[in-house]
Every structure is written in structure tokens, then in C-alpha cells.
Amino acid sequence: MAKVPDLFEDLKNCYSENEEYSSDIDHLSLNQKSFYDASYEPLPGDGMDKFMPLSTSKTSKTSRLNFKDSVVMAAANGKILKKRRLSLNQFITDDDLEAIANDTEEEIIKPRSATYSFQSNMKYNFMRVINHQCILNDARNQSIIRDPSGQYLMAAVLNNLDEAVKFDMAAYTSNDDSQLPVTLRISETRLFVSAQNEDEPVLLKELPETPKTIKDETSLLFFWEKHGNMDYFKSAAHPKLFIATRQEKLVHMAPGLPSVTDFQILENQS
């Protein structure tokens, strides 16, 4: 048995299918305050149901807006009906305010989470099998084997590595080039390692074939990380959890100690 060669550099060139993600966030400096932070003072009696710039002089016909300024439409009860973001250093006149009031197609600004939308649309496409019949040894020199029932995995010190479970590791594309998603299938079977919740044993899920695209079944995917001589398998479905071993426990998901999340991948040369 020998350690598997480092494949990370070669795989970086395999991501030609990656999708680019472009943020539509406004090009404002991150240290600028949002226009939602504007402070509102009581409106004069003749200012209800009219547009007026905030924090400006009452005698000025044209005002320069600063970082804290925005334009609002206030109803008689003081409720803000409409807001518009303005460019920095933009002049605004009374005519501009009137145009905003008459704009029937003014866009309503709604809170949203680009990150959530981006993650929910994530797809992982199969690239190739990068390891055939490899063995996983943990930091205690225990090898992964099947438990007596055959339904789960466990770790044990072996004198004969032929008794260890052999895995085929398949790589998938990712929108993040810093991560390498993989699946772990028991060689010559249809059983794939599937992550569960913290401290729960990993499952062996039977599939008809290696998935070509994974979108919803992220429990089958693990981000393979390499630090020094050790390998780690972080769950795509539970990003804080790793495949782990522990004395008198089945192979399970854990964030770290007292469980062991450090492995070495041994290549089968028999």
C-alpha cells in the first residue's frame, strides 16, 4: 500500500464548466451607511403627502445629498411609502421629486439574500473517478471496515489491509474552485457514503449508478480537504461536520474532538 499522489493541482484545471457568479450589489463602498439609516424628523404640517429631501435646508431649492440622505414619500400618518437610492453627489431638484411621485413603475426595494439564492441553485456535475479502491486510515491507524450488520461503517486496527473497505472516490465540479466535492462509493457495489446529523452514523445509500449531477442529494457529497499529510471529508449538507471515527462508535459525523476527523488515503496496489 502507498499514499495516493496529490491530485489537487491536476483537478484545478478540470473546472472549465464552472459557472461564474456575479453579484448585483451596488458599487458603493462597504463602509458607507445604507440609506435606510436616515434619521427622520417630524414633518411640518404642509409637508404631508409630498415628496421632500431629508436633512436639507428648508430654503434651498436644490440640495446635495450625502451618504445619509434619501428620498421618501410620507403619508399623513408618517408611514414611508416609497424610497429611491440616489447616486453619490447627485443634485436633486423639486422637479426631480415631482417626477418620482408620478413614476408608476417605481421599483419596490425588497430585502433578499443573494447567498441563499446562489446556494439553493448549486449543481455539482460529475467529472471523473480520481481514486480506485483506496483505503481510509484514521490518525489512530485504524482502517474503515463494515460493521457486523453490513449496514454501517466502523474503524478497527487491521493486520491485513485486505479486510479494509475499498472506496472509489469520484470528483465533481463546484462553483468554488477552492473546494473539491467528492462522493465515496464502496468499490464494486452501489453503496455510497451518506452524511447524517452530528453524532449519527453515516449511512450506506444504494444508488443504481454514480450520479451525473447532484443538486438536492448533497448528503452524498463531501468536500475533500488536504492539510499536510492528512485528509478531511467535510459534509456538503452539514458544512461544520466531518466524517469521523471514535472508540466504540460507528463512523459518524462530527465537528472534531473527541472524535477523529483526520484520515490518510492509501492507494490499493494489489
Swiss-Prot record:
Propeptide residue range(s): 1-112
Gene3D superfamilies: 2.80.10.50
PTM sites of type N6-acetyllysine: 82
Single GO MF descriptor: copper ion binding
Source domain of life: Eukaryota
Keyword Phosphoprotein: yes
Location(s), subcellular: Nucleus; Cytoplasm; Secreted
Matches recorded under InterPro entries: IL-1_alpha, IL-1_CS, IL-1_fam, IL-1_propep, IL1/FGF
Record keywords: Acetylation, Cytokine, Cytoplasm, Glycoprotein, Inflammatory response, Mitogen, Nucleus, Phosphoprotein, Pyrogen, Secreted
Modified residues (Phosphoserine): 87
Glycosylation site residues: 102, 141
An example Gene Ontology CC term for this record: nucleus
Matches recorded under SUPFAM superfamilies: Cytokine
Record-level GO BP terms: cellular response to heat; cellular response to lipopolysaccharide; connective tissue replacement involved in inflammatory response wound healing; cytokine-mediated signaling pathway; ectopic germ cell programmed cell death; extrinsic apoptotic signaling pathway in absence of ligand; fever generation; immune response
A UniProt-annotated Pfam family: IL1
Region (Nuclear localization signal (NLS)): 82-86
Family designation: Belongs to the IL-1 family.
Description of its domains: The similarity among the IL-1 precursors suggests that the amino ends of these proteins serve some as yet undefined function.
Function of the protein: Cytokine constitutively present intracellularly in nearly all resting non-hematopoietic cells that plays an important role in inflammation and bridges the innate and adaptive immune systems. After binding to its receptor IL1R1 together with its accessory protein IL1RAP, forms the high affinity interleukin-1 receptor complex. Signaling involves the recruitment of adapter molecules such as MYD88, IRAK1 or IRAK4. In turn, mediates the activation of NF-kappa-B and the three MAPK pathways p38, p42/p44 and JNK pathways.
Self-association and partners: Monomer. Interacts with TMED10; the interaction mediates the translocation from the cytoplasm into the ERGIC (endoplasmic reticulum-Golgi intermediate compartment) and thereby secretion. Interacts with IL1R1. Interacts with S100A13; this interaction is the first step in the export of IL1A, followed by direct translocation of this complex across the plasma membrane.
Name of the featured protein: Interleukin-1 alpha
Species: Sus scrofa
